[in-house]
């Protein structure tokens, strides 16, 4: 359903955001 699609997109976006934050912190 629509909710499962939204959850999948939100989970993917969250993982991408965490990855970007981890990369930024790792460079410091």
UniProtKB/Swiss-Prot annotation:
| Cell membrane is among the record's keywords | no
Please name the Pfam families in this protein's record: DD_K
InterPro entries (UniProt xref): Dermaseptin_dom
Carries keyword Secreted? yes
What is a biological process (GO) this protein takes part in?
defense response to bacterium
Sorted alphabetically, the keyword list is: Amphibian defense peptide, Antibiotic, Antimicrobial, Secreted
Predominant place of localization: secreted
Expression across tissues is:
Expressed by the skin glands.
Naming one, the record's GO cellular component terms include: extracellular region
| Covalent S-S links between cysteines | none
Protein location? Secreted
Family affiliation: Belongs to the frog skin active peptide (FSAP) family. Dermaseptin subfamily.
> What the protein does?
Possesses a potent antimicrobial activity against Gram-positive and Gram-negative bacteria. Probably acts by disturbing membrane functions with its amphipathic structure.
Q: What is this protein called?
A: Dermaseptin-H2
